Amino acid sequence: YTGELGRKVVGMLDTSRSRLHRATGSVYAASLPYASRIISVWSGHRPEDRDRIDSVAFARGIPAVGVELLPTSLECGPAVVPGRTACYRCYQRRLHQHRERTASLMRAGAELPEGFAGGEVAIAAGFIGQALADMNRGDAGTSLGGEVRVFDLVQGGLHKYETVAVDRCERCGSRYDRRRHPTAAIAHLV
């Protein structure tokens, strides 16, 4: 987590059995402690950090989700479960494909000062709880997974949608499963 929003959201969650990592700058793979799940919380849009976290989640085979406070919305997701859902990179590609105006607003939001009320903190904590429940669901049923929850801060609307993987994605596509296996690099030696 980072910033005041991250600190307050983490304060609302049961973190007694968690490892907390306060990011003071960019997030890199080596700086992330091993955990059973990775949850990121911050103000602004930080796609490079989210993508690095997602790549660590896929490399370690653990679920990940992030919450971002943007100028007009509070977004949680996608809830990524390696081997079951689309990755963050696919989410970014779909976002740019369908909502270029929103993507430009997100880029602008990274430079704005952090500002939020207690309601946004509670909604973010609730979104994380729902994302964790999604991750723990053993059977995805008819769900595509990669759920994204968005609370519109202007109109007060709540939206939920799922992320569809991009064809031939090297991170989450089933075509590349064998290359992503932890021992793939040394498999020919055994």
Predicted feature descriptions by range:
Residues 1-190:
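Adenine nucleotide-associated cytosolic modules
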